[in-house]
């Protein structure tokens, strides 16, 4: 599975941005752009229990779209957010929705449409995880599942419905899904939804929603039909366009190790360190707690490692990074928070002990800025639960990640 070539052609960031701007020429009177940037989740004015959910999910520092996109959505503005898939759009609108829900009212207040069953279920999972400490009730209404079960859950009451257009329209028509309290409507992957022929259904659904409703459109591109939707349904939307980072995966050999279960990762890591002569390496995990856990485990097995994460004060982090850069410490365990700050040019090996929670961060962990063009090796530990994310990463970057060969020592 993981070695199969992703669909699509080589992604060209400049061409993408140019096309986007061509389509939007002459649209300026319609959009206002929103340029406020919030560099941390704490600075966004989010409620405490939502922040707990965000950090527990493994997010530490907001991605570019999250820095710009969460706050205007929380303010109730109509928003059009354009960024490639995998840049953290899902968590952006999930946070905006969760911040505005009235949890004392167990009625559907937000409706999210997605083009595929898989994406709808993935959004449901993220919404539920981020809203864990808020007690959010979310349900995915998708084709291919029991209509009766949908009706039962909707009648019992949920705060958020995520679904595909066909099933959602059906539930609205049957009045199993009541629209009276819906105040937020999100179209995710709008371009994909329109290319799949859902335009009429989206219009039909919109007719059944209350007249005063906040609309969020999230899309990689803005084809004319998507612009038409925004003109019809949105009021003074703000447009947020995120440019890509100039990083490259060129020259980096990427492999995966099938570890099956989470519990087997530690043994796999220790085996690797015993068979390889590694000059310097960075190991990425998804939470601060895991940094501490893995550091203790590695030290107890006599591996010399240093660790850094967001709970440490800046001074401590600077000292650890200085030691790492000077080569006096050779293995660094860290989280995504520092992926962008590590000058990994001298690092020959990056290990994703945990795959990143969003594809965008994969590039920040293992990519190099083009002017250095150093070679390197990246090894991804993949459990059964990670297979989907590995597929998404390959598709997102148009790369093939091969299974780790037995002669890996020769590659370093």
Curated annotation (Swiss-Prot):
Q: What keywords sit in the KW lines?
A: Acetylation, ATP-binding, Cytoplasm, Helicase, Hydrolase, Initiation factor, Nucleotide-binding, Phosphoprotein, Protein biosynthesis, RNA-binding
Keyword Plastid annotated: no
Concerning SMART domains, the annotation shows: DEXDc (SM00487), HELICc (SM00490)
Cysteines engaged in disulfide bonds, as pairs: none
Q: Which InterPro entries does the UniProt entry name for this protein?
A: DEAD/DEAH_box_helicase_dom, Helicase_ATP-bd, Helicase_C-like, P-loop_NTPase, RNA-helicase_DEAD-box_CS, RNA_helicase_DEAD_Q_motif
The UniProt entry annotates the motif Q motif at: 39-67
- Domain named Helicase ATP-binding: residues: 70-240
In terms of CDD domains, this protein maps to: DEADc_EIF4A (cd17939), SF2_C_DEAD (cd18787)
SUPFAM superfamilies, from UniProt?
P-loop containing nucleoside triphosphate hydrolases (SSF52540)
Question: N-acetylalanine occurs at which residues?
Answer: 2
Catalytic activity as recorded in UniProt: ATP + H2O = ADP + phosphate + H(+)
Query: Where is the PTM Phosphothreonine found along the chain?
Result: 145
> What PROSITE patterns does UniProt report for this protein, alphabetically?
DEAD_ATP_HELICASE, HELICASE_ATP_BIND_1, HELICASE_CTER, Q_MOTIF
Q: Which organs or tissues contain this protein?
A: Highly expressed in the whole plant.
Give the record's family classification.
Answer: Belongs to the DEAD box helicase family. eIF4A subfamily.
Q: What does this protein do?
A: ATP-dependent RNA helicase which is a subunit of the eIF4F complex involved in cap recognition and is required for mRNA binding to ribosome. In the current model of translation initiation, eIF4A unwinds RNA secondary structures in the 5'-UTR of mRNAs which is necessary to allow efficient binding of the small ribosomal subunit, and subsequent scanning for the initiator codon.
Name of the protein this chain belongs to: Eukaryotic initiation factor 4A-1
Organism, scientific name: Arabidopsis thaliana
Give the classification, highest ranks: Eukaryota, Viridiplantae, Streptophyta, Embryophyta, Tracheophyta
């Amino acid at each position: 599975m993981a070695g199969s070539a992703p669909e699509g052609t080589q992604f060209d960031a400049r061409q993408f941005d140019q096309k986007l701007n061509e389509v939007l020429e002459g649209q300026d009177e319609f959009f206002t752009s929103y340029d406020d940037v919030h560099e941390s989740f704490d600075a966004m004015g989010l409620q405490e229990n939502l922040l707990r959910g965000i950090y527990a999910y493994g997010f530490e520092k907001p991605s570019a779209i999250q820095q710009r996109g969460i706050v205007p959505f929380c303010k109730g503005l109509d928003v059009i957010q354009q960024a490639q898939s995998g840049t953290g759009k899902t968590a952006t609108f999930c946070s905006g929705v969760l911040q505005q829900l009235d949890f004392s009212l167990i009625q559907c207040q937000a409706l999210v449409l997605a083009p595929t069953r898989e994406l709808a279920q993935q959004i449901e999972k993220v919404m539920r995880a981020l809203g864990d400490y808020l007690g959010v009730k979310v349900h995915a209404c998708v084709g291919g599942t029991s209509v009766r079960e949908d009706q039962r859950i909707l009648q019992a009451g949920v705060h958020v419905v995520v679904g595909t257009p066909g099933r959602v329209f059906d539930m609205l028509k049957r009045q199993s899904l009541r629209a009276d309290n819906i105040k937020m409507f999100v179209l995710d992957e709008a371009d994909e939804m329109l290319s799949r022929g859902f335009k009429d259904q989206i219009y039909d659904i919109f007719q059944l929603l209350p007249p005063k409703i906040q609309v969020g459109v999230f899309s990689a591109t803005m084809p004319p039909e998507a612009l038409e939707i925004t003109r019809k349904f949105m009021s003074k939307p703000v447009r947020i366009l995120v440019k890509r980072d100039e990083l490259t995966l060129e020259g980096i050999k990427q492999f995966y190790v099938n570890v099956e279960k989470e519990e087997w990762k530690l043994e796999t890591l220790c085996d690797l360190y015993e068979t390889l002569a590694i000059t310097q390496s960075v190991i990425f995990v998804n939470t601060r707690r895991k940094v501490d856990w893995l550091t203790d485990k590695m030290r107890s097995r006599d591996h010399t490692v240093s660790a850094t994460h967001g709970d440490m004060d800046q001074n401590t982090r600077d000292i650890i990074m200085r030691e790492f850069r000077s080569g006096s410490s050779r293995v660094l365990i860290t989280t995504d928070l520092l992926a962008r700050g590590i000058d990994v040019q001298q690092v020959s090996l990056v290990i994703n002990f945990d795959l990143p929670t969003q594809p965008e961060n994969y590039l920040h962990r293992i990519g190099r800025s083009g002017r250095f063009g150093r070679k390197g090796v990246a090894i991804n530990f993949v459990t059964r639960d990670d297979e989907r994310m590995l597929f998404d990463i390959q598709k997102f970057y148009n790369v093939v990640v091969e299974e780790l060969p037995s002669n890996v020592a020769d590659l370093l």
